[in-house]
Amino acid sequence: MSCQPFTSTDTFIPLNSESSATLPLIMHPSAAECLPVSNHATNVMSTATGLHYSVPSCHYGNQSSTYGVMAGSLTPCLYEFPDHTLSHGFPPMHQPLLSEDPTAADFKQELRRKSKLIEEPIDMDSPEIRELEKFANEFKVRRIKLGYTQTNVGEALAAVHGSEFSQTTICRFENLQLSFKNACKLKAILFKWLEEAEQVGALYNEKVGANERKRKRRTTISIAAKDALERHFGEQNKPSSQEILRMAEELNLEKEVVRVWFCNRRQREKRVKTSLNQSLFPNSKEHLECR
């Protein structure tokens, strides 16, 4: 179709006049007849005429499908667009229309249900809780047995893992006052620390045990046994091996203990006599040297 210019002058009538309802709007042929009419525009306009509200068409690329509110379905747009693009040429869509979408309502309800399940506390009778309580009690007993305080454990962990570990952290773990998630994380750290502490303790005990074997434990002799040994010492200060064995059996002591007692008693007797002689004759040594 060829475009021919008008020979007569264009005529415009105000819209608010009485004759505006009967007279059509005259457009220039270059704006009306020369533009191609697309099928998509025809479909959108025909669909919009069947609805009671204006419909913004939402397209993505060259897809043939159209996202938006269609006739017989109140489904919102898949993508969110700025307000000025959605309202260009059409009034904005009312919010109640979008909020009544059953798909969105089901999704929100499912999301709230999952969030509620996440926030719900764990069952206190679950095996994980019982295992955590058992480890907390065992850790406290083994820590005390090794001779470590809560402060010692907190300082040791803080030196390796950071300042977030302290005596308060260990106290709250042993009293089950931490959250389940944090308690599980701390359990693994404390388990490793406990293993290393027990290894160090075993090496220390082995070293101390070797030193104790070199030096026997000091024996305590009762007063009655001392009196009996003093009487035997007055009678015989150098008893034979058979006499020492007989005295040990009578006093319920070891033979080595009785033998050592007589040796120590003779040494003490010698020191007493030497001290007494020096006190009685202080100048005896000088007198002998002068002679």
From Swiss-Prot:
Q: Which UniProt keywords apply?
A: Activator, DNA-binding, Homeobox, Nucleus, Transcription, Transcription regulation
Q: Which GO terms describe its molecular function?
A: DNA-binding transcription factor activity, RNA polymerase II-specific; RNA polymerase II cis-regulatory region sequence-specific DNA binding
The record's listing under SUPFAM superfamilies reads: Homeodomain-like (SSF46689), lambda repressor-like DNA-binding domains (SSF47413)
Q: Which PROSITE patterns is this protein grouped with? A: HOMEOBOX_1 (PS00027), HOMEOBOX_2 (PS50071), POU_1 (PS00035), POU_2 (PS00465), POU_3 (PS51179)
- Motif 9aaTAD boundaries: 5-13
> InterPro entries, alphabetically?
HD, Homeobox_CS, Homeodomain-like_sf, Lambda_DNA-bd_dom_sf, POU, POU_dom, POU_domain_TF
* Segments forming domain POU-specific: 124-198
GO CC annotation terms, alphabetical = nucleus
Quote the DNA-binding region ranges, renumbered to this chain. 214-273
User: Which compartments does it reside in?
Assistant: Nucleus
- Name of one Pfam family that matches: Pou
Give an example GO biological process.
Answer: positive regulation of transcription by RNA polymerase II
**Entry function:** Transcription factor involved in the specification of the lactotrope, somatotrope, and thyrotrope phenotypes in the developing anterior pituitary. Activates growth hormone and prolactin genes. Specifically binds to the consensus sequence 5'-TAAAT-3'.
Q: What is known of its domains?
A: The 9aaTAD motif is a transactivation domain present in a large number of yeast and animal transcription factors.
Per the similarity annotation, which family is this? Belongs to the POU transcription factor family. Class-1 subfamily.
Subunit details: Interacts with PITX1. Interacts with LHX3. Interacts with ELK1.
- This protein is called what? Pituitary-specific positive transcription factor 1
Organism field: Ovis aries (Sheep)
Q: Which gene encodes it?
A: POU1F1
